[in-house]
UniProtKB/Swiss-Prot annotation:
Database matches in PROSITE patterns: MFS
Function of the protein: Essential to lactate transport.
Entry's transmembrane regions: 141-161, 177-197, 206-226, 231-251, 264-284, 297-317, 364-384, 403-423, 433-453, 458-478, 490-510, 536-556
Name assigned to this protein: Carboxylic acid transporter protein homolog
Main localization (coarse): membrane
One Gene Ontology biological process: plasma membrane pyruvate transport
Region (Disordered): 1-65
Length: 616
């Protein structure tokens, strides 16, 4: 085992005197201490705590507030993020056990496991104290991400509110125009994979800018598409951008924020989707006052926000957290090379990556299958209840443009409130019970929202319906992250979400086709001229609420599972310590490389990068 250049705290019988740094190693040679730019050895003194965890000494090179914030975050990851100290270290329950006894025990505990109400604490539920800790830079990055997701939703719902003029322009039935909505959802998975890999590996900034540039192109070109085929091609670009923007926008918005504030900020961030719908319907109505083709101006006007965001993002560097991640990766790689006897690590080829992915799927196939099925329901909920709402209000109920605008705005305000309130409410109920409550309430409001067919009923019941739909989404992201296994969280959680989204891509097209089976009026030739969209939306939305309820009930949860990566946390702490001492990470890596070039007597067996990570 190679020695470590990084600072080591000595526990047990060995004690380190204050003001001294003790280097030790387990190999056959000693490594030199780290030095600063002038060649002077660094005398780094770590923080020391007594058994009661009272701080006896802190590094004077770090500001007091910074030290306290770091300590708070570490305690939060270990204590606040654990419910009564429950940890899931081995994750044995992620591996399927299909014995009869295991299945029986699991089935009998589906109801009783819901009865545990977690301890109520205003400190856990009230986000205001933590929001006050947000700096202006934190808010700057948050709104940069928030408005990027809003612009994506705005671009998507521009088609939803313009179905009627688009159908007239291309002389196509409504179901063909709604296929443009479905196409966006179909190709979102491709965008998520392409830009997700780029975002995780290299940058948050440039994928963000690229996706926004694609939105500008798509929104600018859509009104100029003179054929239906060109229209679909342009919406295909929108789908790629929409799939890619979510990951980099959410990371930009959340990852630098205080840890305790992230739950509330996550719910607020997702509400940008509903706000995008509000922007689309308001400006559609506003431009419709002046011109019959006001929908074209809506598309062109919507590009101002992504253009503004592109210039805004160009002015700011990568987030602080991601900058530390990039530096930590350099340290991880240098330590892995050192552990490999100084030899460069071989890169895994495509076949080896596929074999690794196959092993992961074989290990977690049951959990993965459950998560895919679970995600189908909420994705259908969103699109089945929202995408055709303006069409139903205009074409079936014959409401005025002003009434349609008011209803869409009010119901989406309900969606915004639901996401934030349920996001905090689940801290008391837990994930599953919170989801079941949202599904039950939503099912109760489905019939009056769609079937009473009056403006007042839609305003009241519709507000509560979308309150519950987005209440589901206020809980689901963290529930999904907690269920996914630690060693395959990105693969299992990300792929299951995208497959669930893919399954729901045709929701609006299915609704328009089913509406033809429930005609309200026919012309002299027997052709349907007025469809019952409300009945179809009520049937599909109610069915999906029941489906989602069943999936959540038979599932399980890992409330407040620790989502942090111990390896990355360790190396990020090293980055912070080195930079606090005025060291360059590049210099640290160079020194590690020089030390790794020294031949060790016991270096006959080389380590892989994965084995090094396991050792850490």
């Amino acid at each position: 085992m190679s020695s470590s250049i990084t600072d080591e705290k000595i526990s047990g019988e060995q004690q380190q005197p204050a003001g001294r740094k003790l280097y030790y190693n387990t190999s056959t040679f000693a490594e030199p201490p780290l030095v600063d730019g002038e060649g002077n050895p660094i005398n780094y003194e770590p923080e020391v705590y007594n058994p009661d965890h009272e701080k006896l000494y802190h590094n004077p090179s770090l500001p007091a507030q910074s030290i306290q914030d770091t300590r708070d975050d570490e305690l939060l990851e270990r204590v606040y993020s654990q419910d009564q100290g429950v940890e899931y270290e081995e994750d044995e329950e992620d591996k399927p056990n299909l014995s009869a006894a295991s299945i029986k025990s699991y089935a009998l505990t589906r109801f009783t496991s819901l009865l545990h109400i977690h301890e109520f604490s205003w400190e856990n539920v009230n986000p205001i104290p933590e929001l006050r800790k947000m700096t202006w830079q934190n808010w700057n990055y948050f709104f940069m991400g928030y408005f990027a997701w809003l612009s994506a939703a705005w671009a998507f719902f521009c088609v939803s509110v313009s179905v009627a003029p688009l159908a007239e322009l291309y002389d196509r039935p409504t179901k063909d125009i709604t296929w443009g909505l479905g196409l966006v959802l179909f190709v979102r998975s491709a965008g998520a994979v392409i830009f997700g890999l780029w975002t995780d590996k290299s940058s948050r900034k440039w994928p963000y800018i690229t996706c926004l540039f694609l939105f500008v192109i798509a929104q600018l070109c859509t009104p100029w598409c003179d054929t239906y085929e060109k229209f679909l091609g342009v919406r295909w670009i929108t789908g790629i951008a929409m799939g890619g923007i979510y990951g980099c926008a959410s990371a930009t918005a959340i990852e630098d924020a205080p840890v305790k504030a992230r739950s509330f900020l996550s719910g607020l961030f997702f509400s940008a989707y509903a706000m995008g719908f509000i922007f689309a319907i308001i400006f559609y109505r506003a431009f419709g006052y002046f011109r019959d083709d006001g929908w074209k101006i809506l598309f062109w006007f919507s590009i101002f926000l992504p253009i503004l965001l592109i210039f805004w993002r160009l002015l700011w560097p990568e987030t602080k957290y991601f900058t530390k991640v990039l530096k930590a990766r350099k340290l991880i790689l240098s330590d892995a090379v050192k552990a490999n006897g100084g030899e460069p690590l071989p890169k895994a080829n495509f076949k080896q990556k596929m074999v690794s992915m196959k092993r992961t799927v074989q290990k977690y196939w049951l959990l993965f299958a459950y998560l895919v099925v679970l995600l189908v329901g909420p994705n259908y909920l969103t699109h089945a209840s929202q995408d055709l709402l303006p069409t139903m209000l205009r074409a079936q109920l014959g409401l005025s443009k002003d009434a349609v605008t008011v209803i869409v705005v009010v119901t989406n305000i309900g969606a915004i409130c639901g996401g934030m309130i349920f996001g905090q409410f689940m801290e008391v109920t837990g994930r599953r019970l919170g989801l079941l409550i949202a599904c039950t309430m939503g099912g109760c409001f489905t019939y009056p929202a769609f079937m009473l067919r009056s403006e007042k009923a839609i305003l009241g019941a519709g507000f509560m319906l979308y309150f519950c739909v987005f209440g589901v989404w206020g809980i689901l992201p963290i529930h999904l992250a907690e269920l996914a296994p630690a060693d395959a969280r990105a693969l299992v959680a990300g792929l299951s979400y995208q497959l669930g989204n893919l399954a729901s891509a045709a929701a609006s097209t299915i609704e328009t086709q089913l509406a033809d089976r429930y005609p309200l009026e026919r012309d002299a030739s027997g052709a349907v001229i007025k469809e019952d969209y409300a009945k179809v939306m009520a049937i599909l939305t109610g069915s999906v609420f029941i489906f989602t309820f069943a999936c959540v009930f038979v599932g399980h949860e890992k409330f407040h599972r620790d989502l942090s990566s111990p390896v990355m946390k360790k190396y990020i702490n090293q980055v912070e310590e080195y930079e606090a001492d005025g060291l360059s990470i590049s210099d640290i890596v160079e020194q590690k490389t020089e030390c790794a070039s020294v031949k060790m007597i016991d270096s006959n067996v080389s380590k892989t990068y994965e084995e090094h990570i396991e050792t850490v």
